Amino acid sequence: MEDYGSYSTPLTARYASAEMSHLFSREMRINTWRQLWLNLAIAEKQLGLTQITDEAIEQLKAHVKITAPEFEIAAKEEKRQRHDVMAHIYTYGLAAPAASGIIHLGATSCFVTDNADLIFLRSAMDLLIPKLVNVINRLSQWSLRYKDIPTLGFTHYQPAQLTTVGKRATLWIQELLWDLRNFVRARNDIGFRGVKGTTGTQASFLALFEGDHAKVEELDKLVAKLSGFDNVYPVTGQTYDRKIDIDVLQPLASFGATAHKIATDIRLLANLKEVEEPFEAGQIGSSAMAYKRNPMRCERICSQARYIMNLIPNALNTASVQWFERTLDDSSNRRSLLPEAFLFTDSVLKILLNVISGMVIYPKVIQKHIRAELPFMATENIIMAMTKHGASRHECHEQIRVLSHQAGRVVKEEGGDNDLIERIKNTPYFAPIYDELDSLLDASTFVGRAPEQTESFVNKDVSQALAPFKSMITEEKVDLAV
């Protein structure tokens, strides 16, 4: 039964996926600790520690998944000892009595806490990467669909030379491809802390193996291998270096900037009524203004993306205050920092995929906006056409300048339509090109190589970048909880 009387994070209740929420759950955390304790015992036994029996290993295996009653036992024990790891060693030992004396043998708390965190970081990246791949894939399809639709370009959020709807989306895709590269790189760089002891010297393990350095080195590698890692950090303090957290979170923050930019562009286009995010049949935009269709999904992306971007200073500060071999300044901070970074990123990817999958454009509105600006943009072409008929460029420029300013006053001071072309048609000076004006105002002639650039980029660059992830691509519909 849900507890309505205490705070619960909206991340799990409203936004993040079930699989990401489960990854950072208490159950997954303790199950991972138990698996690490099992891996350590297996490796130590394999390397000759006779105090670890077959029965101990079998009992550890049989109880590697924690039960609800065991959580209650651990909670009571933690309250008594004020130490979560020791509480769970005690609880695991009750379930596996033959192993109670060898659980955590030679290890320090960071053997389970830090190695588990590294497992979670890598697993979380494994959940994010397919979602980012699908965002890129669907946006690429959308880009190709609208590669030939002219639209106003904007610089300084003022109308500029035309581009196409699809070409604009390639700018978003390119940033997302860089994010994908960064995600994969960060994921593959994550190593394993291994078995390093209280200050990273492996002294306790050297004592266990009676000074056999080779066995200690082999233990480090074997536990890492059993835990799914080939790369073990060669040196650590008590913890793995907190700069690793920075390296993992930085790509998430960078993606947050990408997502914020994309969502902001869509919001601005929604204001112009050119593009719209999905809007459900029963969705309400405002409790007071019944007509409103607010871009709430893109607003949510921006809200959550800002949170992701602002986590980096926290990670930097945490890394900077790790004195010598470690301090505990990091512990409670990272309990929130790491899960929230991934839960928010997961949520943003989920919303972004939902928006892209249902995003629509309104070509007639786009054309209306082009008609309002294109006459001004076409003036250079008109001047060139007149010079081909023998007109003076300087004189033609002056004629266009006067008429443009007149038309501009109509638009700005009277709220009228841009009538520059009508003024040109009513000016005898421009009679030599009357028959050419319609072709000179064909919007498709103002987009340069935008359609070709879009097609080439998607079919070559994007296709090549997504090739290693082909098996991850799906057409699955993405629904939001709210």
Curated annotation (Swiss-Prot):
Residues forming the catalytic site: H156 (proton donor/acceptor), S286 (proton donor/acceptor)
ATP-binding keyword on record: no
SUPFAM superfamilies, per the entry: L-aspartase-like (SSF48557)
Entry's Gene Ontology BP terms: 'de novo' AMP biosynthetic process; 'de novo' IMP biosynthetic process
Catalytic reactions of this protein: N(6)-(1,2-dicarboxyethyl)-AMP = fumarate + AMP; (2S)-2-[5-amino-1-(5-phospho-beta-D-ribosyl)imidazole-4-carboxamido]succinate = 5-amino-1-(5-phospho-beta-D-ribosyl)imidazole-4-carboxamide + fumarate
Record-listed substrate binding positions: R14, Y15, R82, H83, D84, T108, S109, Q238, R300, R326, S331, R335
Gene Ontology CC terms, in alphabetical order: cytosol; nucleus
Family annotation (Gene3D superfamilies): 1.10.275.60, Fumarase/aspartase (C-terminal domain), Fumarase/aspartase (Central domain)
EC number: 4.3.2.2
Pathway assigned to this chain's UniProt record: Purine metabolism; AMP biosynthesis via de novo pathway; AMP from IMP: step 2/2; Purine metabolism; IMP biosynthesis via de novo pathway; 5-amino-1-(5-phospho-D-ribosyl)imidazole-4-carboxamide from 5-amino-1-(5-phospho-D-ribosyl)imidazole-4-carboxylate: step 2/2
Gene Ontology molecular function terms on file: (S)-2-(5-amino-1-(5-phospho-D-ribosyl)imidazole-4-carboxamido) succinate lyase (fumarate-forming) activity; N6-(1,2-dicarboxyethyl)AMP AMP-lyase (fumarate-forming) activity
InterPro entries according to UniProt: AdenyloSucc_lyase_C, Fumarate_lyase_CS, Fumarate_lyase_fam, Fumarate_lyase_N, L-Aspartase-like, Pur_lyase
Pfam families: ADSL_C, Lyase_1
Superkingdom to which the source organism belongs: Eukaryota
Assigned keywords, A-Z: Lyase, Purine biosynthesis
Family: Belongs to the lyase 1 family. Adenylosuccinate lyase subfamily.
Subunit record text: Homotetramer. Residues from neighboring subunits contribute catalytic and substrate-binding residues to each active site.
NCBIfam families with a match to the protein in the record: purB (TIGR00928)
Protein name as it appears in the record: Adenylosuccinate lyase
Species, as recorded: Schizosaccharomyces pombe (strain 972 / ATCC 24843) (Fission yeast)
Lineage: Eukaryota, Fungi, Dikarya, Ascomycota, Taphrinomycotina
